[in-house]
């Protein structure tokens, strides 16, 4: 399944070796749910992209990735558009949504693990690994932040892969290292450490059931059908998305 997904970036699976996979999603704290009267919308992304929800949550802190290449595909898919942003008008429409919620956003950050774990923010967009790490840290210190990592329709799926540069001098060692990371014992330990899903199926069998049964780490078949693969945006789409983001 991962190899099929990876073909969007590596046709024929000729070069890339997957070692981790995960989802881009959102998390909310107990305080955030309290401000919403304990009721979450059917579409969890509404929490992030509709002012009727962000207005209620701004007092406890909303955080977005400071990464347009991560945020725009999620928002485009939410709007029913091509996540690649191939149509400039689609990107502009997405930017208007971002403008509408911008006054309610407290922080733009590449990583929000600590802020979310402390309860400094109550709604965050991020990858499932970071969000689940924040949840684990919060539970470890028993600070009662009450983080829930949501699994709404339209999550973005990504794959981290190994590639060997064409001009690499130590190709044999590179292959040895890749094989080492794919060893079930090693891959399982790494997956547990970062709360990502190892690409190796035998590794998954060595991970705690609590993690394997967490859909924001190991999405189920329906999640996969309802989501999309994070795309490689064209140079023009990237440039426009960055320009719109900076505005």
Describe each model-derived feature in a short phrase.
Residues 1-120:
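Extracytoplasmic ligand-binding site segments that recognize negatively charged/polar headgroups
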Residues 24-26, 32-34, 68-71, 128-132, ...:
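Solvent-exposed loop/turn segments at secondary-structure junctions
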Residues 27-32, 76-80, 158-170, 189:
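A bilobed periplasmic-binding-protein/Venus flytrap-type ligand-binding module shared by bacterial periplasmic
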Residues 46-49, 72-76, 95-98, 113, ...:
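Non-transmembrane alpha-helical segments in soluble domains
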Residues 91-99, 142-166:
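Periplasmic-binding protein-like
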Residues 114, 221-247:
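Conserved C-terminal helix/tail region of periplasmic/extracytoplasmic solute-binding proteins
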Residues 123-143:
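A ligand-binding cleft/hinge motif common to bilobed small-molecule-binding domains
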Residues 160, 165-225:
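Mature extracytoplasmic/periplasmic domains
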